[in-house]
Amino acid sequence: MNVTVMFLVLLLLTMPLTDGFNIRATNGGELFGPVQRDAGNVLDHGFQRRRDCPPWCPTSHCNAGTC
């Protein structure tokens, strides 16, 4: 397994799954610094910008891109 795959697996394992991937709210992103914060920002705000439902949110509870 190469370094990139190991890093991505480690990043996924350290992401909290219970709060919509909001990494900054849980640990400030200090674990991987800007890389982890950027990954969290993409997951957090991409759905809100597009007004889509995030995949972890039931459609009936979705309101303008937020659960």
Curated annotation (Swiss-Prot):
Range of residues in the leader sequence: 1-20
Tissue: Expressed by the venom duct.
Protein location: Secreted
Keyword set, alphabetical order: Cleavage on pair of basic residues, Disulfide bond, Ion channel impairing toxin, Neurotoxin, Secreted, Signal, Toxin
Task performed by this protein: Probable neurotoxin with unknown target. Possibly targets ion channels.
Keyword Secreted: yes
Cellular component per GO, a single term: extracellular region
The protein's name in its UniProt record: Conotoxin Cal14.2c
Organism: Californiconus californicus
Family the entry assigns: Belongs to the conotoxin L superfamily.
Regions that span the bilayer: none
UniProt PTM: Contains 2 disulfide bonds.
Domains (record comment): The cysteine framework is XIV (C-C-C-C).
Predominant location: secreted
GO function terms (MF aspect): ion channel regulator activity; toxin activity
Propeptide span(s): 21-48
